[in-house]
């Protein structure tokens, strides 16, 4: 069970939301979970990574582009989703700058089965380097559902430093939605750690421009 009590969570969420109401921003502030680790050696210990799906999409403006076969491109077009077919990808001609630009333009990619294996050959390693290699899109999945799933999935990835941060929501979400998302994210993260809570030095949540609120 989580070492963060529900009361602590609710208090922190209230503070973050109140802070954002006091100082209105011209953009929707993201709420981030910041994690500081201890007893971990990024050089020796296995660097973990894992993804967890949250209940409510943390970033409504998160953009997903479909790299699709004919059917998926038609479905994407009907759903007004950005999409590219194999010909459009070939036109990028493995140009590093253009692939980098594509990786920057969207937050995530979905690719049809027939395309996904060809992506390294057509585009080179650009999407992978940007940490945006496409998720697989099959024909027995509903495109809209799959896009929602990608939008509400967050990734924990341990790099060379002992701190990491992930988006768990935004300030316009309800208290319950934020608390639920944070609870899911914290429990999942702790399950990835070798010694669970013994590896956690501190946990904070903060909005983009707000003050950090300590959870643990």
Curated annotation (Swiss-Prot):
GO terms for molecular function: RNA binding; structural constituent of ribosome. The lineage of its organism: Eukaryota, Metazoa, Chordata, Craniata, Vertebrata. Keywords: Cytoplasm, Ribonucleoprotein, Ribosomal protein. One of its GO terms (biological process) is T cell differentiation in thymus. Belongs to the universal ribosomal protein uL1 family. One of its GO terms (cellular component) is cytosolic large ribosomal subunit. Transmembrane segments: none annotated. This is Large ribosomal subunit protein uL1. InterPro entries: eL8/uL1-like, Ribosomal_uL1, Ribosomal_uL1-like, Ribosomal_uL1/biogenesis, Ribosomal_uL1_3-a/b-sand, Ribosomal_uL1_CS. Component of the large ribosomal subunit. The ribosome is a large ribonucleoprotein complex responsible for the synthesis of proteins in the cell. Component of the large ribosomal subunit. It is found in: Cytoplasm. SUPFAM superfamilies: Ribosomal protein L1. PROSITE patterns: RIBOSOMAL_L1.
């Amino acid at each position: 069970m989580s070492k963060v009590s529900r009361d602590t969570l609710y208090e922190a969420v209230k503070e973050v939301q109140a802070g954002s109401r006091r100082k209105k921003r011209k953009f929707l502030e993201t709420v981030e979970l910041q994690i500081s680790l201890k007893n971990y050696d990024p050089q020796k210990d296995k660097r973990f990574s894992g993804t967890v799906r949250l209940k409510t999409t943390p970033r409504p403006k998160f953009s997903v582009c479909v790299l699709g076969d004919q059917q998926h491109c038609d479905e994407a077009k009907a759903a007004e989703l950005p999409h590219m077919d194999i010909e459009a990808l070939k036109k990028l001609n493995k140009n590093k700058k253009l692939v980098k630009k594509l990786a920057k333009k969207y937050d995530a990619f979905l690719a049809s089965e027939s395309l996904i294996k060809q992506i390294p050959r057509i585009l080179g390693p650009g999407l992978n380097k940007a940490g945006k290699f496409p998720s697989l899109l099959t024909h027995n999945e509903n495109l809209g559902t799959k896009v929602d799933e990608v939008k509400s999935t967050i990734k924990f990835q341990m790099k060379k430093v002992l701190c990491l941060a992930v988006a768990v929501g935004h300030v316009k979400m309800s208290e319950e939605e934020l608390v639920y998302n944070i609870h899911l994210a914290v429990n999942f993260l702790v399950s990835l750690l070798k010694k669970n809570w013994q590896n956690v030095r501190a946990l904070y949540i903060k909005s983009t421009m707000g003050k950090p609120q300590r959870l643990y």
